[in-house]
Amino acid sequence: MIQAIGLIANRVGVEIQQYSHIIIPEVVKNVNDTKQQVVDSTFTTLSRWVIHQDKVQSTILLPILPYFSTAIKTSKSRYRVLQWFLDTIPSCEGKDIRPIIPIVLDGLLDKAKETRTVATSLLSMILTKWSNEAFLKEAAKRRPIDASQLKTMIL
């Protein structure tokens, strides 16, 4: 079913955006599935949803970003989401990417080294194109020990 959604999105093209609020929240929930095939299909579908004419369409990607913050339940799913962001977010230069900031910060504090590594790469990429102000503001809302650690990473 998930693969079919991706194929339909691919065929429909950028007009698929009008269905994002209905379909994407349900698709994103699958990032936590225990079956690797389901998780892989989920990210393939998400890519087909946002990539048209061989480029990420920021007008489609940006509205779906908020759905990820409630979907991530494990370190493994956080890693995969951050990796997907690393591949897709560069197309959003100059746009509002604030919905992913808490996810990136959680990734920086994650217990899993691979998750921290991809979060650090994503943060570095983001900070070359966007201001660190929103990251610092969000980090300040965390526990003092976490806020201090995050501030060091952000600056």
Each predicted region: which residue ranges?
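Extended, low-complexity, acidic/polar intrinsically disordered regions
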Residues: 1-155
